[in-house]
Amino acid sequence: MGIKTYKPKTSSLRYKTTLSFDDLSKGNDPLKSLTKGKKFKSGRDSSGRISIRRRGGGHKRKYRLIDFNRRDKFSIPARVASIEYDPNRSANIALLVYKDGEKRYIISPKGIKVGDVLESGPNAPIKIGNALPLENIPIGRTVHNIELNVGKGGQLIRSAGGYAMILASDGNYVTVKLSSGEMRLIFKKCIATIGEIGNEDYANISIGKAGKSRWLGRRPKVRGVAMNPVDHPHGGGEGKTSGGRHPVSPWGQPTKGYKTRKKKRYSDKFIIKRRNK
């Protein structure tokens, strides 16, 4: 997908860029049976208190039900019926029509087009968009939508432009290099989809104006130094101040490089190399 720029008729359009939707199927509303209503919580938890700040408002959305698993469709070919926009994620989605008549959405890989035939299973051909166990994917291939637990469905590499690379296979585990630089062992029976995720230009768009952030449900971010002492550790002082201490969160936890990962996690033994800083 290309990037669309605007003539600066107003100051808010000067730096605004959006994605052009030329690659998407024309005139396709989301399949009603694969959508459901999405209730926005405005960052509140079950007790009504703010648990995630700066959330609220935004345009209404229908949630698209995505098949991250594809295990129950092993060896059943599916035709790509359309490639559609999904407001709930950065990647586009593809509508598959299986040979048995069932329809499902998957994350759209880079390079597939309407009419392509995809398949999942241990014996599926090595082709972009096909889902196979990691042990059946050749070393050096890029993959996405990777399972961490057999049968749970893909959890890693699901956003636009994302991919991981198969580096090695030894015993029951396959070494995978994630796009962050982290190298990780994943059980060889876990499923991954071959190829990169499409819509890679998503990372290059410029919002351009505050109003678009509001359309997306993002509210303004107030600096701690602009608050009162009761609201933030950086608050208060006479006139403009620097905060007077090393940067911390509103609850006093150090920020900007402070490691928050627990020292002893069960998954540490699967991480060969931590992500790049």
From Swiss-Prot:
It holds the Pfam family Ribosomal_L2_C. GO terms for biological process: cytoplasmic translation. Keywords: Ribonucleoprotein, Ribosomal protein, RNA-binding, rRNA-binding. One of its GO terms (cellular component) is large ribosomal subunit. Residues 258-277 have a biased composition (Basic residues). InterPro entries: NA-bd_OB-fold, Rib_uL2_dom2, Ribosomal_uL2, Ribosomal_uL2_bac/org-type, Ribosomal_uL2_C, Ribosomal_uL2_CS, Ribosomal_uL2_dom3, Ribosomal_uL2_RNA-bd_dom. Residues 32-58, 225-277 are annotated as: Disordered. PROSITE patterns: RIBOSOMAL_L2. The keyword rRNA-binding applies. One of 8 loci used for multilocus sequence typing (MLST) in Borrelia burgdorferi. The keyword Transmembrane helix does not apply. Disulfide bonds: none annotated. One of its GO terms (molecular function) is rRNA binding. Part of the 50S ribosomal subunit. Forms a bridge to the 30S subunit in the 70S ribosome. Belongs to the universal ribosomal protein uL2 family. HAMAP family: Ribosomal_uL2_B. One of the primary rRNA binding proteins. Required for association of the 30S and 50S subunits to form the 70S ribosome, for tRNA binding and peptide bond formation. It has been suggested to have peptidyltransferase activity; this is somewhat controversial. Makes several contacts with the 16S rRNA in the 70S ribosome. This is Large ribosomal subunit protein uL2. It comes from Borreliella burgdorferi (strain ATCC 35210 / DSM 4680 / CIP 102532 / B31). The lineage of its organism: Bacteria, Pseudomonadati, Spirochaetota, Spirochaetia, Spirochaetales.
